[in-house]
């Protein structure tokens, strides 16, 4: 496997980790929270993230990927992680890309999905239940773990000036 593909696999694992960080312990009602002005709900974001990654997968398998429609939130999160695993395995086996490059996958659908992971974290704050900060450099992220079962923070920030007031 090329270094580019190893890096993309790590990026996908980071996406899995950061998405789960934003979702872990979310209160009831968070999945359908709409911040306003037709912004996507967290549930819609997870489906959109799966859709853009499904689009990326078409460069490996051909065809088209239809937009994901929200179903059950927990099931859609599982499907999102399944898509991450599928893409990672294609990168690991040096499956041929047709019509794009590794760089284009990173600048397009992979970065799009990571942007939405950040939006999930922002929506948690707007919902009144912010995600505690951590030092991501020391996070236990593994290219072999694309599941929803991500490790707890290795180095959570001890000082959190913008923590919710109790």
Describe the function of each predicted region:
Residues 58-98:
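Helix-adjacent hinge/juxtasegments
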Residues 1-2:
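Short, low-complexity N-terminal intrinsically disordered segments enriched in polar/charged residues
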Residues 5, 9-23, 30-68, 99-166:
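Short, contiguous alpha-helical
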């Amino acid at each position: 496997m090329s270094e580019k593909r190893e890096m993309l696999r790590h990026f996908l694992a980071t996406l899995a980790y950061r998405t789960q960080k934003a979702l872990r312990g979310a209160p009831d009602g968070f999945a359908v929270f709409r911040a306003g002005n037709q912004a996507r709900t967290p549930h819609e974001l997870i489906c959109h993230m799966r859709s853009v990654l499904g689009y990326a997968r078409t460069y490996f398998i051909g065809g088209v990927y239809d937009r994901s429609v929200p179903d059950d939130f927990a099931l859609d999160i599982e499907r999102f992680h399944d898509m991450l695993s599928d893409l990672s395995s294609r990168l690991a086996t040096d499956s041929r890309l047709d019509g794009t490059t590794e760089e284009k996958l990173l600048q397009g659908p992979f970065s799009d999905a990571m942007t939405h992971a950040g939006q999930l974290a922002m929506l948690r704050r707007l919902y009144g239940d912010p995600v505690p900060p951590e030092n991501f450099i020391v996070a236990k992220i593994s290219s072999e773990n694309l599941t929803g079962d991500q490790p707890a923070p290795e180095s959570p920030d001890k000082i959190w000036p913008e923590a919710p007031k109790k």
